[in-house]
Amino acid sequence: MLNQIVKLRTNLLQYTNKSFTKYELKLQTIQNSLYGVDLEYDAVEIAKLRLWLSLIVDQETNGLAPKPLPNLNFHLRVGNSLVDTFENIKLWSTRWRGTKKQAKVNNQMNLFNTDTVEAILKRLKDAKVQFFGTSDEKEKQKLSNQIEIEQMELIRSELVAQGKFDVYTRIEDMIKKKTKPFFIWELEFEEVFKNGQGFDIVIANPPYVQLQKEGGRLANELKDQGYETFTRTGDIYCIFYEKGIDLLKDCGILCYITSNKWMR
């Protein structure tokens, strides 16, 4: 996908007065257009390595020290891409933008308005941009912590507005133990979904596993996630199709490696 985007942009440059090296086009594309999620840590690390290698081969040093590689931790994520709730509770919604929410918690009225949310989102965006380009380890850790804190603050605001602060305390305890059983696309990649948008293209090779296998473990995990295609006797690839379509912007393109059984 990276090479295809760079090829298209290179062809378009001839109609403009702008000029970019292949390395610059790749770096811009990685920073602004490529995102990924996988349940397996090793798969994510391999994807990072492939992008780094693709950058290295086109970096012209001209006898100078090579430029530091970008930090991809917040572009390529480890997580369960099909689960975005906790205890069947929605943890974040882009509907926050442009609205005001009011919640009664412990007999106190808490008002979270768009100014508060937008300020957090702005800090989150700025921290991600800085994190992508920094090579200082201390600064990297500082920014990573800030991003996690800002995301948790948005989750807290959502749950408090729902009157479910007790749920937040349980999530906080899990995060401290390095456990996170959900992946919130609209929050992790908020810049993609702002203003009701989504991905232009979603590419995947979904697994083919019957939900009733392993004693119905997958069925139990997904039954309350709100998928219209869910049936206990179904296959997880159907859920992936629904999720992929849901992540697309209007007129977006879904590109999956799939069986031809449904065409027979």
Mark where each language-model region is.
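Conserved S-adenosyl-L-methionine
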Residues: M1-E87, T258-R264
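SAM-dependent methyltransferase catalytic-core segment centered on the flexible catalytic loop
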Residues: M1-F20, D84-F132, Q146, E150-R264
